[in-house]
Amino acid sequence: MQRQKIRIRLKGFDHRVLDVSTREIVNTAKRTGAQVLGPIPLPTRLEKFTVLRGPHIDKKSREQFEIRTHKRVLDIVDPTPQTVDALMKLDLAAGVDVEIKL
């Protein structure tokens, strides 16, 4: 018989908020009797933007901005119905994007 697995992928710009949300999910899953694999940190996506500092001339004067997107993956193996209910009721931070695959 094939084991059922829930894969949860979290994305966020602030790694501290992401780690807190990950910890909440892990604690909730373990409390309801499911086995958790992870969290596995995935590579951080670094996006850089270069803009001119002044509006007129001076092409040599530029400024760089960057956005870092941190990612984590959790696998919940053989979840119980209580685990699924608890995860649906879980309220996570606003800066975290959650993607769930069954």
UniProtKB/Swiss-Prot annotation:
Annotated keywords: Ribonucleoprotein, Ribosomal protein
Pfam families, per the entry: Ribosomal_S10
Mitochondrion listed as a keyword: no
Gene Ontology cellular component list: ribonucleoprotein complex; ribosome
Gene3D superfamilies noted in UniProt: Ribosomal protein S10 domain
GO BP annotation list: translation
Entry-linked SUPFAM superfamilies: Ribosomal protein S10
This protein's record includes keyword DNA damage: no
UniProt GO molecular function: structural constituent of ribosome; tRNA binding
Subunit annotation: Part of the 30S ribosomal subunit.
Entry's family note: Belongs to the universal ribosomal protein uS10 family.
Protein name from the UniProt record: Small ribosomal subunit protein uS10
The species this protein was found in: Parvibaculum lavamentivorans (strain DS-1 / DSM 13023 / NCIMB 13966)
